[in-house]
Amino acid sequence: TVTEQTEQQVTQPETTVETGDTTGNDATTNNTEQTADPASGLNPGETTQQEQTGEEKAELPKVKALYLTGWTVGSAEKRKHYIELANTTEINAYVVDIKDDDGYVGYESQVPEVKEHGTWKKKYDPKKMLEEFHANGIYVIGRLVVFKDPVYSQKRPDLAVKSKKGGLWKDRNGLTWLNPYQKETWEYTVKIAKEAVELGFDEIQFDYVRFDSDSKGLMD
């Protein structure tokens, strides 16, 4: 299951997200609904430029999505199952891991830093997955975990959160994190995101855009 709600999302369509089983089993409903309702910022009686000119405002897509892990979409049998599910229900999108909180990109990335440090695993073929989903009208949202990264923070300890003693800080699960104050960590994430867009992902969802909040004594 999804470990926590998404921290940031590039776009905010009206979205209903039903979480899937991260072990690759059939999806389970979590009844988590996220509806975009941004404030207009207008004072009472004011009208928007579209209303004044008569231009129609573009409607945001209504997305009803399930979350699928990289391992799940790496299975042809499971892809077929979820395509059939989308074709026979109101589901019209899937959230698929680009980089999970295990720190690995789920496919062979061409991003130089990923190649240099080997921070990827062959969980699935993104081109095959995207081709099959898009052929069935399925919108694909790529989930990209940002600072909870126990792999790149070990490969690049200079970019990791440090303890007061100068070593690598670890959360209560013994995992190291990237330091949000280090600009190189932003660039690393953006490069992976740009590659995913070029591959054909329709949207990027950034997760864990923060320090760890579950452990006490962050800098101990």
Protein language model regions, located:
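Active-site-proximal loop/turn and secondary-structure-junction residues that shape catalytic pockets
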Residues: 72, 100-102, 146-148, 208-212
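Active-site-adjacent "subsite" loops/lids of carbohydrate-active enzymes
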Residues: 58-67, 71-73, 147-195
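Aromatic- and acidic-residue-enriched segments that line the glycan-binding/catalytic groove
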Residues: 107-117, 149-171, 212-220
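N-terminal, intrinsically disordered, polar/charged segments of Gram-positive cell-envelope systems
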Residues: 2-61
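Polysaccharide-binding and catalytic clefts of secreted carbohydrate-active enzymes
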Residues: 127, 171-220
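Catalytic domains of carbohydrate-active enzymes, especially glycoside hydrolases
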Residues: 80-103, 199-203
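Aromatic-lined substrate-binding rim segments of carbohydrate-active enzymes
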Residues: 102-144, 220
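Glycine-rich, aromatic-flanked loop segments that form ligand/cofactor-binding clefts
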Residues: 93-95, 125-169, 205
